[in-house]
């Protein structure tokens, strides 16, 4: 079902109903771009740590816009042994609600726009008819504006005319406004004396003059009139005064309050759908979904925190249970029988032996998708086939039980090992980002960090390391790369070869990481020392409170890269070979290591705790057991 601004309100109850009755959801997003600077290859280096990958995506991807959101709900019909689906395709755009609303700025990537256009994407539905939204801070600010407005005019929203914050004594009116107020009072006196006229429209005036009018009338006419501010077609604000009895005045105030609440809900817009998904506590499925999750949290909840651990805490607060089908398909027992994990190819493979495609039917009134026609890169369709892939793989796990089960539900312990682990694209030895604990820290004692002139190409690196047999190269930027050797014993020899070289330098991966950690510590120490110097000065000034602001990244350039979508990025053959070769022997001590530079408390963690407080009434459908299933655990080694 296609949802745009004009039919969003009329169909919102259908969305809520679908979410409420579903067993699980599948989601997908389409964006205005992927990377504002680095190429996709540089953005997804094979030896990124989870922290580095998060920082790259946060810096280079979050200024793009998620402008199409696909949601497909799945409910199992036990009578007919089939799934009933409801698919929604939302077009989203941050239309300013009023003059004080945030005017969102975002960037576009030409290759991404060109690719979506080639797939028949209708951009008019985004820019002309996209559903507005607000994040939680913007919603809070808008609510405060409404509360302040009601406080000035109608007693903070109470039905009594006089505000408890408004003086019941005569108002002090500036000399230059006395004539204006006297004229208004005179017109109101004429209105009250007239038997024919019921309403009086005052001329448009300034906000200060309207405030004086409200204050004067609340003191002079506590009963008998109703005062309301309206807007002309030219956006000029004016006051309408009506003669009413007390019952009619209360009725109008109730209508006005209901209208304001409706306007507020309209401004929150699509965020209400995301809140409903989050508050359900149900399993959310995605394919290669790290970017989808980051954009969803960033766009509809709050800006992403600087620290990865804070992002994890925030994400699990919003979405208690996530499952990535790309990771699932890349893990045993699927890894050996699924060669290509891109979404389109995965959907095709799961129709073949040993898998059984699920029996699926669209709910009445909802359009059905034909997978033979492949409507890829329509978010609703991608969400639909993502859900199909999950069902097929989950049911396949049931075949290992004794006796075998043909249907494995979204609440089954068989799929718990895959919860809250998001696939890391192209990382050779860390398959996933673990949202519920420390990330894997594999040994990289066979990896070298190499710096070299900008003119060098891949062939130059192969020539440099020709004496060391098979190698794998992962470019970092134009002047550096990681090179992995086939044997760790060769590393000291390779490092020694660069001792007297002028054009290049080779160091071990451990040395590279150690120097980066030192730089990070020095930078933080400098920041802390600077703060110690600033703090006394702040206390001695009268310039108000000082607060650290979030750092907002802006695109310095729009680099048109090759036409690539996040769905069809699969590990290269070389990377796959190294992935299979990696020993991955990780000790418990290594797994428990955390970043020694991590701050104990920060703005991001405060936001996560705030989200938890807002969701204290959450009643998830189903529960997550602390004990993982013994079968098919996502491996600690890759």
From Swiss-Prot:
Residues with the Phosphoserine modification: 163, 167, 530, 557, 583, 587, 619, 623, 627
Residues with site note (Interaction with poly(A)): 326
UniProt-listed InterPro entries: CAF1_poly(A)_ribonucleases, Nucleotide-bd_a/b_plait_sf, PARN_R3H, PolyA-riboNase_RNA-binding, R3H_dom, R3H_dom_sf, RBD_domain_sf, RNase_CAF1
Residues given in the record as a divalent metal cation binding sites: 28, 30, 292, 382
Chain residue ranges for the region called Disordered: 143-165, 573-638
Compartment(s): Nucleus; Cytoplasm; Nucleus, Nucleolus
PANTHER family: POLY A -SPECIFIC RIBONUCLEASE/TARGET OF EGR1, MEMBER 1 (PTHR15092), POLY(A)-SPECIFIC RIBONUCLEASE PARN (PTHR15092:SF44)
Self-association state and partner proteins as the record states: Homodimer. Found in a mRNA decay complex with RENT1, RENT2 and RENT3B. Interacts with KHSRP. Interacts with CELF1/CUGBP1. Interacts with ZC3HAV1 in an RNA-independent manner. Interacts with DHX36.
Name of protein: Poly(A)-specific ribonuclease PARN
Gene: PARN
């Amino acid at each position: 079902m296609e949802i745009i601004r004009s039919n969003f309100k009329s169909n919102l109850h259908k969305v809520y109903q679908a979410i409420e009755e579903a067993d699980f959801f599948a989601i997908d997003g389409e964006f205005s771009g992927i990377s504002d600077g680095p190429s996709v290859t540089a953005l997804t280096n094979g030896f990124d740590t989870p922290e580095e990958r998060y920082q790259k995506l946060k810096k280079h991807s979050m200024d793009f816009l998620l402008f199409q959101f696909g949601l497909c709900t799945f409910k199992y019909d036990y009578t007919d042994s089939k799934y009933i689906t409801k698919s929604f395709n939302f077009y989203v755009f941050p239309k300013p609600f009023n003059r004080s609303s945030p005017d969102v700025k975002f960037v576009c990537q030409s290759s991404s726009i060109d690719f979506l256009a080639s797939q028949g994407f209708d951009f008019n539905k985004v820019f002309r008819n996209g559903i507005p939204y607000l994040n939680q801070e913007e919603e809070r600010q808008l609510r405060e504006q409404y509360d302040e407005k009601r406080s000035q005019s109608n007693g903070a929203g109470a039905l009594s005319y006089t505000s408890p914050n408004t003086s019941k004594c005569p108002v002090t009116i500036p000399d230059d406004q006395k004539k204006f107020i006297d004229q208004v009072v005179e017109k109101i006196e004429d209105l009250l004396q007239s038997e024919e006229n019921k309403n009086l429209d005052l001329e448009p005036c300034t906000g200060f003059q309207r405030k004086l009018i409200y204050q004067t009338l609340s003191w002079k006419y506590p009963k008998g009139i109703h005062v309301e501010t309206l807007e002309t077609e030219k956006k000029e604000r004016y006051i309408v005064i009506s003669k009413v009895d007390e019952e009619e005045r209360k009725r109008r105030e109730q209508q006005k309050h209901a209208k304001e609440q409706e306007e507020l809900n309209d401004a929150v817009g699509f965020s209400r759908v995301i809140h409903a998904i989050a508050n359900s506590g149900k399993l959310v499925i995605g394919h290669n979904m790290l970017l989808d999750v980051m954009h969803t949290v960033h766009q509809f909840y709050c800006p992403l925190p600087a620290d990865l651990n804070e992002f994890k805490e925030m994400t699990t607060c919003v979405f208690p249970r996530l499952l990535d089908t790309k990771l699932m398909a890349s893990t045993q027992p699927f890894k050996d029988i699924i060669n290509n994990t891109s979404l389109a190819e995965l959907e095709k493979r799961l129709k073949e032996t040993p898998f059984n495609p699920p029996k699926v039917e669209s709910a009445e009134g909802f359009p059905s998708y034909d997978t033979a026609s492949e409507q890829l890169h329509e978010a609703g369709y991608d969400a639909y086939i993502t859900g199909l892939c999950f069902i097929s793989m989950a049911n396949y796990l049931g075949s290992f039980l004794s006796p075998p089960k043909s249907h494995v539900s979204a609440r089954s312990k068989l799929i718990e090992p895959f919860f809250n682990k998001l696939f890391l694209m192209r990382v050779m030895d860390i398959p996933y980002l673990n949202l519920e604990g420390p990330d894997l820290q594999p040994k990289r004692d066979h990896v070298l960090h190499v710096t070299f002139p900008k003119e060098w190409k891949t062939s130059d690196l192969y020539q440099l390391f020709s004496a060391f047999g098979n190698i794998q190269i992962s470019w970092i930027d134009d002047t550096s790369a990681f090179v992995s050797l086939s044997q760790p014993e060769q590393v000291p020899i390779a490092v020694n070869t660069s001792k007297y070289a002028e054009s290049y330098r080779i160091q071990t991966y451990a040395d590279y990481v150690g120097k980066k950690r030192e730089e990070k510590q020095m930078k933080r120490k400098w920041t802390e020392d600077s703060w110690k110097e600033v703090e006394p000065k702040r206390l001695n000034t009268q310039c108000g409170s000082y607060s650290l602001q979030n750092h907002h990244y802006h695109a310095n350039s729009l680099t048109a890269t090759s036409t690539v979508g996040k769905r069809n990025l699969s590990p290269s053959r070389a990377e796959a070979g190294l992935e299979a070769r990696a020993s991955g022997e990780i000790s418990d001590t290594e797994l428990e290591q955390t970043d020694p530079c991590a701050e104990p408390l920060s703005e991001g963690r405060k936001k996560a705790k705030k989200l938890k407080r807002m969701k204290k009434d959450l009643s998830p459908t189903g529960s997550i057991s602390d004990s993982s299933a013994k079968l098919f655990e996502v491996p600690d080694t890759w």
